[in-house]
């Protein structure tokens, strides 16, 4: 470990100069523990990470900042693929935005589980599983039919005895549906712009993050500045 630390002290991280071009970007943030993370912008066309910065939490201003830096250098954002975090569609509201199908399905599963107990949940999960092989018209129809059948159900309220306070009786099913409804305009962007070759997942950057964590976690005792040097070396040198 001491040898590794000494080597990192000697390393001067130099970012490779790449000629700016028009490309689809995948911006996202990954964390190493609760309050230390790295926000990364990956160029899909080049399969390279072009910009990154340390963060203590995921906030939209970081994405605004990263986008501006890249555009000031001459990079053109033709579209982005995001994980669905609220606020991301606003950062990139002037270009096509695709929400990752994997993350959308993960969100719905978080609310419904893999084996929903209610009939409403079971039917909604079946609709969700159609996402990767559906299109906007078909998926919208399926969601609309589900809402028509279960609208009263997801609006049912339970009142707390002796108070005026209440909560939605089937809150998790409701949340799963609202997530799909809210993100629907961004779930089939990749089909609307075939010429841009937009993927429907963030797999390219997810794979980069997995590789990064495998490497960094081996040296978990590193001081913060040394750890970031290692992160920069890995992010800047990766191509797959």
Regions found by a protein language model. Name each.
Residues 78-86, 92, 126-240:
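Acidic/histidine-rich catalytic cores and adjacent linkers
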Residues 33, 96, 114, 118, ...:
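Alpha-helix boundary/capping detector
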Residues 79-125:
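Conserved beta-strand -> loop -> alpha-helix junction used to position metal-binding or nucleic-acid-contacting
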């Amino acid at each position: 470990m001491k040898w590794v630390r000494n080597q990192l002290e000697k390393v001067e991280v130099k970012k490779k100069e790449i000629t700016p071009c028009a490309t689809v970007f995948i911006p996202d943030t990954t964390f190493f523990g609760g309050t230390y993370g790295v926000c990364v912008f990956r160029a899909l066309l080049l399969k390279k990470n072009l910009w990154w910065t340390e963060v203590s939490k995921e906030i939209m201003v970081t994405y605004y900042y990263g986008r501006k830096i890249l555009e000031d250098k001459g990079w053109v954002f033709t579209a982005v693929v995001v994980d669905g975090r609220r606020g991301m569609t606003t950062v990139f509201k002037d270009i096509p935005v695709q929400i990752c199908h994997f993350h959308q399905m993960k969100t719905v599963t978080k609310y419904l589980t893999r084996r929903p107990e209610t009939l409403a949940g079971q039917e909604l999960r079946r609709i969700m599983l159609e996402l990767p092989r559906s299109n906007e018209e078909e998926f919208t129809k399926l969601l609309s039919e589900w809402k028509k059948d279960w609208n009263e159900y997801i609006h049912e309220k339970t009142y707390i005895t002796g108070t005026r306070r209440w909560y939605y009786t089937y809150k998790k099913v409701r949340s799963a549906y609202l997530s799909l409804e809210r993100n629907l305009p961004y779930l089939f962007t990749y089909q609307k712009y075939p010429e841009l070759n937009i993927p429907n997942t963030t797999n390219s950057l997810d794979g980069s993050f997995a590789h990064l964590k495998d490497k960094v976690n081996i040296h978990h005792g590193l001081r913060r500045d040394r750890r970031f040097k290692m992160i920069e070396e890995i992010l800047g040198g990766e191509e797959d």
